[in-house]
């Protein structure tokens, strides 16, 4: 309210109605408007269960329930905002679903570990921006969490062409970027991937892949 700004915040640990029976929280991304009103919330759908031998072990599903829906993009003064969280970044399906629903900006508040962040963070953010032709805004936790984990930091903004237009580093910091929707529409006009998508094929391939994985 004091600054008159929108805030994209996450992830918050939220107790849902199922807390008494599951004893698991939801990892929640909240969007507030300049009056402080809660405009939208998204519960993280992809949980980070990974094991990097000798480096990182995480099992988010041991204390977290997965969300069950993708939240429709929210209209803001700078464009239509899509909400995701951290590990969701590894799944292009959610960014493409948000783009299909009208998103112009994708937000990923995150806490990548140092091993995964140094290898994948920028690559994934640029990939999501290029394939969706959206701006990607990714806040990032930084610093030492405990003796076994350090967060990577490097909060970043990527434009629809895939260029990094603003970036922090490992320590606490703040960066700014202009959201130019005219430029976004130009990129989409010049490379019209939405018109070229073969949705008649993707469902068949996904079903075959799911059957093979099972």
What are these regions (language model features)?
Residues 1-8, 80, 86-175:
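CN hydrolase (nitrilase-like) catalytic-core segments centered on the catalytic cysteine
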Residues 9-11, 28-31, 72-73, 155-157, ...:
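Short beta-strand scaffold segments in enzyme catalytic cores
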Residues 12, 43, 141:
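Histidine-centered beta-alpha loop that forms part of the nucleotide-sugar donor binding/catalytic region
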Residues 13, 73-74, 129, 168:
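A structural signal for short hydrophobic beta-strand segments in well-ordered beta-sheet cores
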Residues 15-101, 114-124, 190-193:
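Active-site catalytic loop in hydrolytic enzyme cores
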Residues 37-40, 163-165, 185:
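Short helix-loop capping/hinge motifs at secondary-structure junctions, enriched
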Residues 180-182:
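C-terminal accessory region of radical SAM enzymes
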Residues 185-214:
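A short C-terminal boundary segment appended to hydrolase-like catalytic domains
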